[in-house]
Structure formats: C-alpha cells, structure tokens
Amino acid sequence: MSPLPLIHSITNRILNAPKNAAGELFVACNELYKVLLQITGIDLEEAANRQTQTLESGHAIGLTWAAMCIQDYMRTKRFMDGIYQATNDKLKTITGRPVHILYAGTGPFAALILPLTARFNEKQIQFILLEVNEQTFNCLQKMVDTLQLQKYIHRIEKADATKWKLPSNEPVDIFISETMQQALVKEP
C-alpha cells in the first residue's frame, strides 16, 4: 500500500496548523521526516551523504543535511503555506493549462510541494524538479516512483539550476528556491 495517504494526512495537518502551533508543527514535520526517510532509505550517518558538493556556482549541501531541512518546522510551515497560497493565486488567473511550478534544489523529498499533491490534481499543477546532488537526486526519483507521483511531473532532472535552461516553449508560473541561512550563502 502506498504511503501517500499518510503523507497527505501529515502535510494537511501542517497546512491547517496555525503558524504559532509550534508543538503541533514539530510533531507533524518529524512524522513526515520519518516517513520520507523510510521511503528513500537514506542512511544519515553514511559519510558520503554528509559531503558538500563543490560546483562552479557554489556549494550544494550533502544529502543528509538536505533531508534534515524538513525538521526546521517553522521554516517548513512558512514555505509550504507560501507555495500553497501562490498556487491558489495562479489557479485563479491561468486557464486552459496547469500551473507549472519549477522547484530548484528539491532535496531528496521535494517536501515543500508534497502538500500540493493532496489538494490539487495533475491537471491543475505540474512540476519541474531540479536537483544537482546525485545521491539526493536518486532519492528524489525513488520517492517520486514509490509515491507514484509521475503524473504530476512535467520534468525531473539532475541539474545545476544556475546553469539549467528552460526550454523556450515551456512556461514557469511559480519558481521555488529555498533560500538558506547565512552559513549556506555559497549554495547555488
């Protein structure tokens, strides 16, 4: 049985929680983290998963650190709320096609867009997912396959978003880039 209904239940709790419900958000984000770790099989202790990848454009954090970002429950809540609201706003103005959402630097879970799959169908939203770290990309692909989210995926690529070129005939309505704290200022 697919874990997607459980993920939808957890992400709905995150979206429905008040912004100041720290305890509730902490519990929900940790539940989501554990489910996604189980799906992807990430070994958080493996040395290779902790390695920062150096690129021409900066640094890409290791798989372990990317996976752990979801545990910052206030940050996760703010991003999920903002993306959900932006999607609702775009759905009011775009007709005849889905809203196209480009998510650059998805991490292993693309966690910030998972709530959208609980609230919208594939005719309403389509994702372009970009991830530069190979181990992280492989986990992302495993998660998409396990949850059977392919119908939502317009494009999924292992790519450096700072160098990636959007084909001229493809629209992007919402662009997601997780701006990280000062310690990650060199992350692309």
Q: At which residue positions do the language-model features occur?
A:
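Conserved class I S-adenosyl-L-methionine
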Residues: 95-109
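Phosphate/oxyanion-binding active-site loops and adjacent basic polyanion-contact surfaces
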Residues: 68-83, 105-112, 132-136, 185-186
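Conserved SAM-binding loop of SAM-dependent methyltransferases across substrates and taxa
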Residues: 107-123
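S-adenosyl-L-methionine
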Residues: 122, 130-172
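Class I SAM-dependent methyltransferase Rossmann-like catalytic core
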Residues: 52-91
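N-terminal auxiliary segments of SAM/dcSAM-dependent transferases
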Residues: 1-51
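A short SAM/SAH-binding and catalytic strip from SAM-dependent methyltransferases
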Residues: 172-187
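Residues at the starts of beta-strands that form the adenosine-phosphate
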Residues: 100, 124-126
